[in-house]
Amino acid sequence: MRRSGIPAGDTPDGGGVRSARAAADAPERPRGARALAAGSCVLGAIVAWTLGTGPAAHAEPVAACLLPRTAAHHSEGVVDPAGATPAGTAPAGYPRAQGDVNALMVFLSFPDAPPALDPQAVAADHYPATARFWSAASGGRFRLHLHTVDRWLTMPRPATAYRINRDWRGADRTAYLRDALTVADPEVDFRGYDVVYLVADPEAPGVDSDATKVVNLARPVTLDGNPLARLVTVFERHPPDRNVLAHETGHVFDLPDLYDRPPPGSTADWDTQVGDWDLMGSQFGLAPEPFAWHKWKLGWLRPGQVACVTGPGTSYYDLAPDESPGGGTKLLVLRTGPDSVLAVEARGRGGNDADACRTGVLLYRVRADRESGDGPVTVVDGHPGSSACAATSVYPPLADAPLGVGESYALPGGAARVTVTGREPDGDWAVRVTQRTAGARDAGRDA
């Protein structure tokens, strides 16, 4: 056979699939006709402090806000620890989410359940929707092309024999992968594919949709000379949950799970960290557009679209909505520690975010030292006393998280404040940032 063995030490990503569930005024901005909101709404958690009229803060070269990668699985770091690898360069073993990327979809059936569905009908559950999602999110910089094996390949054992479930035992998962590749290898040419989806017959007994996930191999498996470090195992229903394969594809390109999985037996909510914001939190979210931080990490933001604020004083920015396809500043970053930043971006209602509950300026904390599924990103609740879109949001308390005109947020301890001062005719959001010290510190984080 033309493959190396499947090592028993493979590990899964957490898998994004689960059952559907639903102040004192600063000096006026010294730029053109930008309307300032009358007064600012200071949030309850803010420590009030008066903004001075000291030196204007300035945007440093973005290198000052790049977080180093850590040993955390799917680290949110953008560069290697030595700072030698630029944003958009994939870590070792990961493909780059840029340009034309080829994906292969292999369909697996089971001997006790002849499939009733045509493979192309199953493929249509996921494509072209998955490719369209990532093309829109990247502004056309990432183009995913699907190639399918247009027939079912029969596994040697029933699906029930593999005990497929979300918390799949390693031995059962390894047996499934070994059998799948043994069946596929003589029939499929794996050369040239960066992404491989192994899709099980959704109607076969023993196929559990909650088990869909990316499996990271302890050692790459080489198929037709193509080393693959991870495989996407798909066990979805027909039709599937929306955006589920787009979420799993994000893992292939080193994006982490942003939900916070409760301990076994707990009934706590999964979506308390980011709510509807970003596909990697929930594929059911109302605003699944990837965070601008993720777009920077994947190399989709052009030079000049990221601003890094470090020095003390006051500075002003116009933020173009994250989901908009054009140019403009998409990401504002305040360094808060060796492994953490406060990220600021605008969110509108268009593209992948057409169903967003609220628009405005969204703030979130990013930690490069947090594991996937352990809170690497936390959205700042801009309205902690309220919630929104209760009937459709995955986590209503964060559905209205963005700040509106006249509202502000200050880091605990008052090291920095972000204020939304206006909305421009072109849809951009005007933001004022004031820092008291060089490099904001987020109290309780990296202290």
Regions found by a protein language model. Give the residues of each.
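Secretory targeting and sorting signals
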Residues: 29-59
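Non-catalytic surface loops within mature trypsin-like serine protease
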Residues: 109-112, 202, 284, 348, ...
